[in-house]
C-alpha cells in the first residue's frame, strides 16, 4: 500500500555552493550547491527514506506501482522514467551564464530530454539578482562578438529578486542564478547544461571549468523577452498557480500555521 514517500536528498558540492543546505548532510559538508530532492537522472536515482518501502529507488517503485504512483497518463508516456527533477539551489556565488537545449536538440545530441525549468525564490539576500535572457534583441554574430571580447554581461538582462518571487525558464533562454539566492527548482529530468561564461574563475586546483560555446550557439533564443517573472497573488490556505507548461504545472500553497 502506498503512503507519503520521503527520499534521501542527493547532495552536490559546487564551486559556488553555500552553507544553507549543509543541514541535509550528516557530515555538515560545506559548499553544497544543490540538493536533489526527487530525481530520476541516470546514476542519481532517488531512494526512499521512510516506511516499509525504504531503500527502494524511484524507478523500482514505478516499475511495481506504475500508474498508481505517477498516474496512468504519465506511466504510459514515460514508463519508469520519472519526468521531473526537483531540487534546491544555494548560490553563495554567481552561477555560470548558461543555456539548456530543447527536447529536439537534446534528443539528437544526447539521446535525452531537454530542460525547461521554473524557479521559486525561497530566500534572497539584499541585492540578489538573476540573469534572464538579453536586454535587447540581438543576433548570433553580436552574441559571439561580445563573448569573444569578454563583454557578454553588457548584453544580459539582470533582474533584482526577492523572497517569494517565481520565474519561468524555457529551454533556449540564457540565464544564471546570482549570489545570495536560495531557490527551489522544478525542471524536466535532464542534467544537460551548456556553460557559456564562467567569469574566468578557477577551482581549488587552479583549473577553469569547461565552456560549451559551440554547443550553445545554436540553441540560444536571441530575442528580447522582458517578462519571465510569474505574476501571482498568494493567499493563506489557498492554492495559487505559478507555472503551467507542457512539462509541469506548479502551484503554491501558503499555510497560516505550521503543519
Give the positions of each predicted feature.
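Gly/lys/ser-thr-rich phosphate-binding loops in alpha/beta enzymes
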Residues: 5-17, 156-165, 173
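Short, well-ordered, mixed-charge alpha-helical segments that flank or form enzyme active sites
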Residues: 105-106, 127-132, 138-143, 169-170, ...
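Transition-metal
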Residues: 1-138, 198-226, 241, 250
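Tight coil/turn sites that cap or link beta-strands
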Residues: 102, 170-172, 180, 256-258
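Active-site glycine-rich loop that binds ribose-phosphate moieties when present
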Residues: 138-168
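Conserved metal-binding segment of the jelly-roll/cupin
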Residues: 97, 160-179, 186-188
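Fe(II)/2-oxoglutarate
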Residues: 153-156, 181-259
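Surface-exposed loop/turn positions
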Residues: 93, 165, 257-259
Amino acid at each position: 500500500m502506498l503512503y507519503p514517500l520521503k527520499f534521501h536528498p542527493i547532495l552536490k558540492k559546487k564551486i559556488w555552493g553555500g552553507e544553507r543546505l549543509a543541514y541535509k548532510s550528516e557530515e555538515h559538508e560545506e559548499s553544497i550547491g544543490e540538493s536533489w530532492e526527487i530525481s530520476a537522472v541516470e546514476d542519481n536515482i532517488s531512494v526512499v527514506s521512510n516506511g516499509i518501502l525504504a531503500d527502494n529507488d524511484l524507478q523500482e517503485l514505478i516499475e511495481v506501482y506504475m500508474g498508481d504512483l505517477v498516474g496512468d497518463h504519465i506511466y504510459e508516456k514515460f514508463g519508469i522514467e520519472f519526468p521531473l527533477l526537483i531540487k534546491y539551489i544555494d548560490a553563495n556565488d554567481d552561477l555560470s551564464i548558461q543555456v539548456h537545449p530543447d527536447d529536439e536538440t537534446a534528443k539528437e545530441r544526447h539521446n535525452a530530454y531537454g530542460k525547461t525549468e521554473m524557479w521559486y525564490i525561497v530566500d534572497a539576500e539584499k541585492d540578489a539578482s538573476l540573469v534572464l535572457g538579453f536586454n535587447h534583441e540581438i543576433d548570433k554574430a553580436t552574441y559571439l562578438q561580445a563573448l569573444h571580447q569578454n563583454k557578454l554581461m553588457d548584453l544580459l538582462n539582470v533582474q533584482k529578486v526577492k523572497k517569494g518571487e517565481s520565474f519561468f525558464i524555457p529551454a533556449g533562454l540564457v540565464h544564471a542564478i546570482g549570489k545570495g539566492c536560495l531557490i527551489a527548482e522544478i525542471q524536466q529530468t535532464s542534467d544537460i547544461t551548456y556553460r557559456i561564461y564562467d567569469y574566468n574563475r578557477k577551482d581549488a586546483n587552479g583549473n577553469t571549468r569547461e565552456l560549451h560555446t559551440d554547443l550553445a550557439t545554436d540553441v540560444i533564443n536571441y530575442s528580447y523577452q522582458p517578462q519571465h517573472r510569474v505574476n501571482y497573488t498568494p493567499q493563506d490556505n489557498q492554492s495559487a498557480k505559478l507555472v503551467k507548461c507542457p512539462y509541469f504545472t506548479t502551484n503554491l500553497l501558503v499555510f497560516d500555521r505550521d503543519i
